Amino acid sequence: MLWMKSWFETRWRFLFVLGFAAFQLINVVHHNVPDQPFAVAKLVYPMSFFITIIGIMLGGAGINTQVAFRAIKGLHGSMYFTLALPVSRYRLLATRAATGVLELTAVIMLLCAGLWTTVPQLRALMTLPEMLVYGFALSVSAASFYSVSVLLATFLDGQWQIWGSMIFVLGMQEVSERLPVPHPLDLFRPLTTDSPLATHVLPWSGMGISVVLAAILFCLSMKIVQLREY
């Protein structure tokens, strides 16, 4: 029941992100010249931007109604239904966050499979399983940005949550470019220069840092959820 409720409250953002992924795929295919060598860098950086955006969008969908903070316009029945459920806020938030992670992973995997299928040069560079491993690395590396969006969604609504997440992530990127951030602590490297698409090696340190940071941010989100009144 909770999983179905999470899906109903996130499905429109998921479908929008899926359409965004289709546009990204069409754009890559349109600008690709099959007879020329494939420039990996031209794909890695747009992909990192795309992954960050969809992580932010999927992270905040349905958080407030899922944990019954307030009745948002058009979702009043959802809030009252949530209040009637004999479940804890921790379970509500965990289910909602897990739903978003699954949606994020699904979009990334579909995009990677689509790129491998439609770009001949990629098929020459790697196999489909290797491309899906690249998608897995992207999903794990995006977990920290996703968790930032979840955290902000616990006390911000709609567009404020999206803009707040974008400003925070852009600020992190600016700091990583201007300050000597240690290589393993740079959250953007696994999506760009250390991407398996370029190195053919999984960025284990970057992925590990992303998972640890995501866990910390989720714990903070849970604390906020437990302290909020409705």
Cite the ranges covered by each PLM segment.
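Aromatic- and glycine-rich beta-strand/loop motifs that create alpha-glucan
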Residues: 1-21
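Secretory targeting signals
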Residues: 25-29, 40-47, 94-162, 205, ...
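Terminal transmembrane helical anchor/hairpin motif
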Residues: 27-44, 153-155, 162-230
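Long, hydrophobic alpha-helical segments
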Residues: 45-69
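Hydrophobic cores of alpha-helical transmembrane segments in multi-pass inner/ER membrane proteins
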Residues: 52-61, 143-147, 206-221
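Transmembrane helix boundary and interhelical loop/hinge segments in multi-pass membrane proteins
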Residues: 60-81, 97
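Short helix-to-coil transition segments within interhelical loops
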Residues: 81-89
